[in-house]
Amino acid sequence: MELIVRAVDVGFGNTKFVTGIGGGRASDIRCASFPSRAYPSPRDPSKALGSEGRKTFAIPIGGLYYEVGPDVMLAADAFRATEIHGDYIGTPQYMALVRGALRMMKVDTIDLLVVGLPVAVFAAKKAALEKLMTGRHDVGAGKSVVVHKALAMAQPNGALIDYATQHDKVEAMEHEQSLVIDPGSRTFDWLVARGMKLSYKQSYSVDRGVSNILQLIADDISQEIGQPYTNLDSIDWAMRNGKTLTVYQRQYNPARMRPMVEIIAKDAVAAMMRRIGGAFDVQHVILVGGGAFLFKKAVKQAFSTHQILEMKEPMFANVRGYQIAGTNYAQTPLSSANRQRGATVAEGEGA
């Protein structure tokens, strides 16, 4: 019987996951996403007046219901419910996002679930996250999903695997050095690898992500209007689409902050360059992640003699790579043995 392998990548901005694998090729992997927001409520919000037709799910955790899903912004209040800190994976919000993704995968059992971590915390939190993901997950509405085994990967490693697989370069890159740059919502991650083997000493992440840029612009708007401006999602949309914002019926152009945005991007790239040392032996510079468009100029300046490789739908590069790695792992004898040993299913909160 074919094993069911799925992947989920909970970022600070968006939760990405695999919904299907089509014909089995990397290009056939189907992905989806929703904002990484989880709004708590003492009662099931799916039963509340006005929630009909809303594409969200109520995930029960610890006596509360956390509303997550594509239309979660319709459940938002004035407070932007995010949990952006180093212990993010230990929060009920994180678990609610994972379980929301599991719910949308529409499977009852997953033999191998592949998840990701920022590079800086990968070694410290890998075992804990794999344990947290394994077991029976209550995904709401009387449904549950059983995960038999979990595998955690460093987030940019997924993008490296995705790039090498899609371009049929896995063997060709075996002795070549690659640098994967992954600007996310909270962290700016990078990964150095020879072939598919990571160089942990050169790989890392710093807290210089898209959220820093959005907050910088929000602070400027706040000074202009004389009161706090907190709608970071509107700023993000305007930046991605090259649009102006309407604030109190007046137009505000985020492009005016471009020089300050570039300083943040250069700070992140400079931190990376100090860590990796010289770039003369780097054959592949791969830029991925939802924040790539904000950091592209700084990356090109740092690697002026290199071609910067970009990918289609860069936001999903990591989760596609997780799926490829998980599918390959599930075909190994080691995976079969582990599955037989771990056949019992744990129960509880994030078992």
Question: Which residue ranges define each predicted feature?
Answer:
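Nucleotide/phosphate-binding catalytic cleft detector across ATP-hydrolyzing
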Residues: 1-178, 197-212, 224, 230-351
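Ser/Thr-glycine-rich phosphate-binding loops at phosphate-binding pockets of nucleotides
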Residues: 183-189
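PRPP/pyrophosphate-binding module of the type I phosphoribosyltransferase fold
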Residues: 190-195
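Long, charge-rich alpha-helical interaction segments
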Residues: 215-223
